[in-house]
C-alpha cells in the first residue's frame, strides 16, 4: 500500500519499518529510552542491551496503530524473564501526561529500585518517555529539571513536556527536596 491510499480504520499503521529495530539510547547504566519494541525485538533488547524490564507508556490507540497486543507483549516478556509494566499515557496530551505522571514515575521507580536495567518507551521515544525519564532523573539523581533535561538531551533528542514537569515538581532550576 502506498502513502496516499487510505487504509481501513482497523488496519495497523506502524510508524517504523517492518524490519527495523527500535532506536535505543542509554541514559544511565540502568535506564534506556527508545522507540517501541515489537515481539521480535524483545529477545534482541535482552541480548544486545541486557534489558531486564520494559516500561511501556503506549496507550491502547498506540498499540493498535502499531499492530501490538499487550497480552502478547506481556507473555513474551514473561517467557524471556523480562518484567513488563505498562502505564498508558495518551500521545501528545500534556493533560494526560500531567494526570498520569506520578503513576508513571512510581512505576519506573519501582522497576529501578528492583535493580533492573529498564527500557522505557512510548512510540518514538521523543516525548512521553523522555518526560518521565527527566522527571525520574530530577527526583532520584539530585538534578534540577534543567540539569536533567540537558543531561537527557545529550544522550537522546527529544521534546519533553517541561511545563508538565514544572507543574509537578516546581521551578526548572530547583533541586529536588530531600
Task: Describe every region a protein language model picked out.
Residues 115-134:
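A phosphate-binding catalytic loop at a beta-strand-loop-alpha-helix junction
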Residues 160, 177-178:
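Residue-level signal for secondary-structure boundary elements
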Residues 20-22, 27-117, 139-169:
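Cysteine-based protein phosphatase catalytic domain of the PTP/DSP
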Residues 168-177:
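The feature captures the conserved acid-bearing segment of alpha/beta-hydrolase catalytic domains
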Residues 2-3, 43, 135:
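Residues in intrinsically disordered, low-complexity segments of regulatory proteins
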Residues 1-19, 178:
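Non-catalytic regulatory/accessory regions that flank a structured catalytic core
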Residues 6, 12-15, 85, 127, ...:
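Short, intrinsically disordered low-complexity segments
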